[in-house]
Amino acid sequence: MHSLFRKRNKGKYSPTVQTRSISNKELSDLIEQLQKNADQVERNIVDTEAKMQSDLARMQEGQLPEHRDAALQNVSDSEKLLYVLEADSAIAKHMKHPQGDMIAEDIRQLKERVTNLRGKHKQMYSLAVKEADPRVNWDTLVDEKLDKLSSQSFGTDLPLVDSQVEQHNIFHNEVKAIGPHLAKDKEQNSELQAKYQKLLTASQARQQHLSSLQDYMQRCTNELYWLDQQAKGRMQYDWSDRNLDYPSRRRQYENFINRNLEAKEERINKLHTEGDQLLTAEHPGRNSIEAHMEAVHAEWKEYLNLLICEESHLKYMEDYHQFHKDMKDAQELLRKVDSDLNQKYSPDFKDRYQIELLLRELDDQEKALDKYEDVVRGLQRRGQQVVPLKYRRETPLKPIPVEALCDFESDQGLISRGYSYTLQKNNGESWELTDSTGKKLAAPAVCFIIPPTDPEALALADSLGSQYRSVRQKATGSKHALQQRHEVLRTENPGDASDLQGRQLLAGLDKVASDLDRQEKAITGILRPPLEQGRAIEDSAERAKGLKNITNELLQIEPEKTQCTAECEAFVQALPASGTAPLLKTRVEDTNQKYERLVWLLEAAQEKVDVANRLENSLQRGRELLASYENRLIQDDTMPESGHVLDRKRQELEAMASELQAHKSLLGEVGKNLQVAKQCSSSLASRFQEHCPDLERQEAEVHKLNQRFNNLSQQVERRAQSLQSARAAYDEYCSGYNRVLQFLAKTPSYEPQETDSLGQMETKLKNQKNLLDELASREQEVQKVYADSQQYQQAVKDYELEAEKLRSLLDLENGRNSHVNKRARLQSPAAKVKEEEAALAAKFTEVNAINRQRLQNLEFALNLLRQQPEAGVTHETLQGGKLSSGMEETWKIKKELEEEIERRQQLENEVKSAQEEIQTLKDQGPQESLVRKEVLKKVPDPALEESFQQLQQTLAEEQHKNQLLQEELGALQLRLQALEQETRDGGQEYVVKEVLRIEPDRAQEDEVLQLREELEALRRQKGAREAEVLLLQQRVAALAAEKSRVQEKVTEREVVKLQNDPQLEAEYRRLQEEHQREGTLREKQEEELSFLQAKLRRLEKERAMAEGKITVKEVLKVEKDAAVEREVNDLTRQYEDEAAKARSGQREKTELLRKIWALEEENAKVVVQEKVREIVRPDPKAESEVANLRLELVEQERKFRGAEEQLKSYQSELEALRNRGPQVEVKEVTKEVIKYTTDPETEQELQRLREEIMDKTRLIERCDLEIYQLKQEIQALKDTKPQVQTREVVQEILQFQEDPQTKKEVESLRIQLSEEQKKQVDLEGERASQEEKIKRKEEELAQQRKERVVRQEVVQYEDEPDLRAEVTAFTNSIDAELRQIDKLHVELRRLQHRRAELERQLEELERERQARRAAELEVQRLQQRLAALEQEEAKTGEKVTHTQKVVLQQDPQQTREHALLRAQLEEERHRRQLLEGELEPLRRKLAALEKAEIKEKVVFSESVQVEKGDTEQEIQRLKKSLEEESQSKRELDSEVTRLEAKLSELEFYNSKSSKELDFLREENHKLQLERQNLQLETRRLQSEIEMAATETRDLKNITTIDSGTHLNSRLWSLEKELDDLKKMSKDKDLEIDELQRRLGSVAVKREQRENHLRRSIVVIDPDTGRELSPEEAHRAGLIDWKMFVKLRSQECDWEEISVKGPNGESSVIHDRKSGKKFSIEDALQSGRLTAAQYDRYVNKDMSIQELAVLVSGQK
């Protein structure tokens, strides 16, 4: 529930609510407040009823009532509270509270009671004194409450228990409200008081039980959720070879095992203990407690199994990657040796001594290769054991065997640990398997391991072997070549004797140095590799032996070294001038130093290896010792049954504990050896930089050994304690059980007989009562037997829990490398004791019930005997027979009832015993002898259905809300434009709020996390529901089995199958798709709307141009220049084409500029977060897009400038042609003839139009065919709309006299032509767009089809037999790698496609969310602007204070907007004045026409003179003005849209829509009405303009030869037009006066603007993550006093107040922390602040904090 509702209007009691997002805490507070109000109403009702009863008694006595007003006030208060309760109930019901319907029903009942109470009040106090109404029947009320309380049960899930807690709190308050009235009523008897006390005690007990049950179930649910998350994390983890982050997973795993496992286990055990305590205390919610205990136990057991699997997987992953690493190292080493053999051991250009040295080194190299052969063989052996991890991420080509790592219960059956299965299909997290019988199974992949071998590992091992053999052969060949060269050099003539001797000595020193280097490498080769894990002791012993061999070799080298150095020194002394003397001297010193360093290194290495050997020996002894004790303990699955065996087992454990303490000294020895090893390692590291690789492992093993010892000691101690407590409890239980059993066996029977006399019957009755008393006294013994049984069972359970814990720890330690044979566990003795105790309790209950029934039978029979009169023997015998028959019938009925009761109790006990047996058997493990097949039934999840319905409702609300917001946005934009037009000249009142959040907006991530949490909650609830259904099914099955076969033991397993309802999932996906379609449809509608608007503007322009085509002219001479006319028409068309291109270029330029500004603003945003260090860099994609847009902008500007230049040239040419003017000759004929003829040009025009329509029709048909073909070719590219370019062609037509029929035909043809032209333009544009897309696609395909040239270097090798096997191996390896690469490429393409699809969906969702948020913010911002502009108070100020870290600065864009609006207002005024000036010539012309005389003439002319009248020019100017108005409106709309987007982003976090939504709706209604009025006015003006244009054309069509009748009609139309124009002028004048008046009222307003910055510093507690103030942090000890003073000094609270009035603008800086104010003007005058600095602040380059420091003079 994530919505909170607005506060109610305190003046009205309406239950209507409005929602917003709330949290769970707020909803719980709402429910708590609702309960308080309901309790208050209940108390008011009870109090009112009591007062009315008191007044009724007084009225019966003839006295006046006392509580009339008080009772009426209580009723009124209750009604008010009921209004509030209805509203809160509506909120709770709307938020889908589980008890929403129940709460509404309770409130309805309270309302009915209050209504009835008001009626009673009115009736009682309005009538005269009469008979008093009956009082409240408290006895009946208490009985009803008792019955209701006794019928209550306990819920099985947490939501139901929560609702029961809330309901019982209300019930308990009602019970407590009855108490004071019973105390006041003295006439109540003690029996009623006792009933009330019983009711109160029972209500308190239920309240405590519900509270404890709720707390226990909540903690169990928390643990179940944690365990479920942990299990899911391990199941979803990647355990394949692709995961290289396994070391961090290993550290995380060991950290949890060492630090958190015991604590978590303690919590689980604590829950189990508390559950047992609740069951022991006979908690009424036994079923719920047992179910949660079993669920926690099952989940914990599954979690331990997953830990075992995780340990195994980590080990296999480490082995896999270590093998590949070692293999890579070995291959690198062999490649290096091969390279050395090729380069270093070449015999070319070397003398004899160098070759001898190379031969010695080559001998050493061959020895090293001999030793390295063991490494290669070891890697080959390890390759046989490597697990094929690659198959975990892909399905193998054929089924492969897998091995189970743990026990797991799947839907199809049980998976046993250690058994083999066959993998059929790899589905990622889940695998499809088959067992040995062919049964199909499905289980998580984490529970299985694919056994060796790995084909890739085998191929690598074979490749390594081939490489090793090749290197050996090459070494042999190199040695042979060096030997041959050496023999050749020996036969050659030696040179100078001294040089020869020097070279011999150098060769000897080189040999000694190479020997020393070889020994040093051998020592480091021993020190650097870590000891082998499985044979550390043997490995350390072998290394010690190797060091001893090195010592012997070093002793052999020492004499040779001494001899060589002595000979070299003698040679240097004898021949110091020899060329080799300096080199010999240097070589001698180096050899001596190297020898000394080697001796020290050898000593340190021997000490290190010896210490490591001792440490490993001590660790091995400790492990073997602990393993022996652990193996002895792990054999005990459960506790022995008999008492003597218990004592013997306890003695064994005590002896084991003493032995462990005796061997504790071994751990001390291990610790000492570890310290010595650390010292040796530190010495090697400091002197020789040789670090020990085994030290960390040895420390971990020592720590693990100590931990195992402590665990073992605790295990032994706890087991001994459990045995001791079990022994004592078992002895007590046996003695009590035997006593009660003997007593029950010896219980006498006092059944009434037919022949019993009255005295005998009384004696039997007395004995039966004594027997019942004795049974009642024995009941305490039965309870003691039950308590002893529970204590024994708990001890056994603790013992078994410790055994299971030890087994789990050992599994985790060993990693389950080898499978332990499963064996059937023995039945727990606790189960046997539990069965005996249950049977004893059932038998005792049976005996007690039988004897109570006997007592009733005896009393009944005794009463019958006492009622019979004394009579004769015959009558007495007859009466006795009748009595016996009646009693027999009664006894039969009661006997049947008794049998049914016993049967029911027996079944209940058997169900309980079966449940306990199920739990016991689950703790013990699976019984191999019994198998139970279960049928799962899918039950719809109520919570999921509820969430589904809520999602449907939310989707419908969001769609409706989006539509309303769009409508409100359009209305408010119109209203904003009108108001801004009114306030352009005056001082504008506004508040600039620019908020920069210091923390990042993570709304999307929060929504994703919230959705995940809700989904997890739904899954848990669904799992709980399915578990309950399964439990009920198992109970029914158990009861049926027990009824048919009582002695059968059945092992039940609960299988919880988590599976969502497919229908709900399909519906949920359908709703998501519908949501996406709604968003897409909305975008399409917006695009269609914009297209229709553009089309409407184009049609209006075409209509105006079409109206202008018919030009009315006065013909004087009939002659025209055809060439000039054609040229003018061509220039006109060219002009319109260029103008259209210029406009489109300007629009593209504006759009590109807007995109660039948006990207720059987006990239310029700075996100700062103090808690987390983040580095914000611009998006490279955004930067590249900005660069592309800038290039496009430059190109468009260049094209635009070229178009402007061409347009200017055309305009100048057109002006020159117009200035030429026509040549006119006038010849006047005095004959007057009136002649009506049809214009031949009109006939030609009609014919031309007909032909053009036919052409256009054929062209459209061809275009339709082409478009259909194009659409078939590019169906995937139809989404984008083509750009339509409309060409407007203006043609002037000369018309003399119009025939009415011809005129109608021309109009119809012209309309058809216009429609065909529009269709043609649209189709041509669409065809051009489709052709462009086809061209682009063909280019892309052409680029993809380019040939790729692959150069391959072909090397031909000779067929050498030795390399053939290696080549074959490499070929197979390469083929395998290529296949793997192909698979990876296919997978990569699939993932990329999936990623693109997900990104597209995310972008669509983000656009939808941003569009909705933008619409909401638009409504909020426009409402705020409207409120600010319409406020008419003298002084207006708005103070904005944010406790967050904000930076408020002025917005220069808004200032420019205001200046632009003022300029547009001035322009509108100027246009109105022009219109008024143009009206005057029209009036004068009308007057002249009225006075003119009418003459008829026949006029012939030889040329045409085109003149435009004043009226036509006026119409043209009006049209032009209307177009300018439309253009200005569009520009204003685009500017307002941009500003609205910017302001909505700035005011996002300061919106107040929730508080002002009511006012907005009223304003929205007003604005809609005003918009309608404006639209009507606009249509009226347009119709008037069209009418004026029509009338003017009609007037111009009449020549001077018309008759007087025609002239009068035309004059009448002109008069009407003038009247309309006058009226329009008056309306405009009135509107201008109103605007001036409103502007005058706005101009006198003062403007006050406040910028506020408050910096508060918080300190984050590293332990809790809570934010603290510096004072709290100082008190908590997180910071010292110095830091506290520093942080306090950095806090600030600056506020800028700017007031603008008639005298100008003044600004001050207010320090709200100290109360001081600093004037900015004074700071400018005094020089503390410069004008440049202030301009920087105004332009947002300087923060208010920096300005405040400068103004205050603090810096």
Swiss-Prot record:
Function summary: Component of the cornified envelope of keratinocytes. May link the cornified envelope to desmosomes and intermediate filaments. May act as a localization signal in PKB/AKT-mediated signaling.
Compositional bias ranges of the Basic residues kind: 1-11
Residues bearing the modification Phosphoserine: 14, 463, 885, 947, 1583, 1656
Coiled-coil features, chain-numbered ranges: 16-125, 182-387, 611-819, 883-1644
Localization per record: Cell junction, Desmosome; Cytoplasm, Cytoskeleton; Cell membrane; Cytoplasm
Matching InterPro entries: Desmoplakin_SH3, Plakin, Plakin_repeat_sf, Plectin_repeat, SH3_domain, Spectrin/alpha-actinin, Spectrin_PEPL/EVPL
Organism, scientific name: Mus musculus (Mouse)
Record family assignment: Belongs to the plakin or cytolinker family.
GO cellular component: cornified envelope; cytoplasm; cytoskeleton; desmosome; extrinsic component of plasma membrane; plasma membrane
Name of encoding gene: Ppl
Positions of the SH3 domain: 397-453
Keywords: Cell junction, Cell membrane, Coiled coil, Cytoplasm, Cytoskeleton, Keratinization, Membrane, Phosphoprotein, Repeat, SH3 domain
Spans annotated as Disordered: 1-20
Top-level lineage group: Eukaryota
Protein name as annotated: Periplakin
